[in-house]
């Protein structure tokens, strides 16, 4: 595939996703405004005075996400166990011991990584928009690191079995960050020019798209395959320069994509918040009405004679002396 083919793939998947974006933005706005900053990093926080979202819905969302964290992936107890194919409790003890040890190693590595804090963000997305996503990789110290991918910044497609096996995501980096990540020689002309400009190096950001999709030529034959023979392709493109800045592959699909409930044949999920939108909007509108009524009751509208302008004491318990003619 050429650069234009990857860009076309990403654009087509984004077009398919567009039908859900309005609902996602509305749910963020009325339930969890903070999530808007995740999905739209360039947006400016909106000071709605506390009347644009529901605190009750926000607390309910947090409780549901916390329940996911407590019962699905609890930090204080084992929630997964590795077993060999055809496992028998009284079978090959050496084999069973190896898998038990592997389970302990995985538990320890997850505990010292950022897995649980990132998983909390994923659960919030899952309960708010119906779809949550997390990316896993190794850092420079060969330790596990996880990244929350906010709903609205990626698009997905499924395999014939209904599993997500294709994902494209859009993100922005400054020229300085891009050079750190891939090296100056991998960057396109526009990014390199910004990198050499002291005023733009740390401030001008550029858009990139990462495409992870099945590799038709890939086979999981060993754990020492060249990138082009691994089961999944990984391509990152600079959209400003229309240039591939990084190309590699994965042995396993590196994204976890979880859906609360399914909506027909769409790869995207549906959350409880989706069905509660009408009730939440009504509650917000009612709160605004009660707020307005309270303001009107506390500070009623007054008719004043022109000659009284500036002489009426509007403070609590204030007294205004008027003439008999004005009365």
Predicted features and spans:
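Short, surface-exposed beta-strand/loop "edge" segments at domain boundaries and coil↔beta transitions
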Residues: 141-146, 162-165, 177-181, 216-223, ...
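Extended, helix-rich architectural segments
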Residues: 1-207
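Hydrophobic transmembrane signal anchors and adjacent membrane-proximal interface regions, especially
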Residues: 5, 29, 82, 144, ...
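Short, flexible beta-strand-to-coil junctions
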Residues: 127-128, 136-141, 160, 211-219, ...
